[in-house]
A protein has these predicted regions:
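Exported/periplasmic ABC-transporter solute-binding proteins
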Residues: 1-174
Length: 174
């Protein structure tokens, strides 16, 4: 949305519609005990010799960028930077964990909840990374009635229930 505004697009009625969380995952059948990243338990100590932490590429994949921020914030980055298995997107990173090729991964909560092959073993503190939000705005100078109807529906209770079912946190609603 910021990029559109920077390019000169009219961005009106902007709201942050949804939020997501960053979670630590393991393969569904893993015996790794749940823990909260940042509670004093190191992620690096949960990895065996030669094992890697699966993340989206930390240079250009949004989930990977958030993962790097969280690991830096929690003081884990130096120990884990060389032990990352980088995926081209968050679903590729999750697939490495689903297949057991990586014992741990960092993905969005919504992706983890959509997979039968992984389980969440921890949630990163919200303060450890930039907020993960999904904005909505009208980007035309003269929005149609259909645009306004859709905007209102997306911010309403019916959409809110759907978003919650898929793991999002609605930031607005009736």
């Amino acid at each position: 949305m910021d990029w559109l505004a920077d390019q000169g697009a009219t961005v009106d009625q902007r709201i942050d519609l949804l939020a997501n969380r960053l979670v630590l995952i393991a393969p569904r059948g893993s015996d790794i005990a749940p823990f909260t990243p940042g509670d004093g338990t190191s992620i690096a100590t949960r990895l065996g010799a030669g094992e890697r932490l699966s993340v989206g590429n930390t240079d250009h994949v949004p989930a990977g960028i958030y993962a790097k921020q969280a690991l830096e914030s929690l003081g884990e980055w130096p120990a884990l930077q060389a032990r990352l298995a980088s995926g081209d997107n968050v679903r590729a990173a999750m697939a490495l964990v689903e297949r057991g090729e990586a014992p741990l991964g960092i993905v969005y909560q919504t992706d983890a909840e959509a997979s039968d092959g992984v389980r969440q073993i921890g949630v990163f503190p919200d303060a450890s990374h930039t907020p993960i939000t999904y904005p909505m705005a009208v980007v035309t100078p003269s929005p149609s009635a259909a645009t306004e109807t859709l905007r209102q529906w997306l911010a309403g209770d019916a959409a809110r229930r759907i978003f919650i079912r898929y793991g999002f946190t609605p930031l607005t609603g009736d």
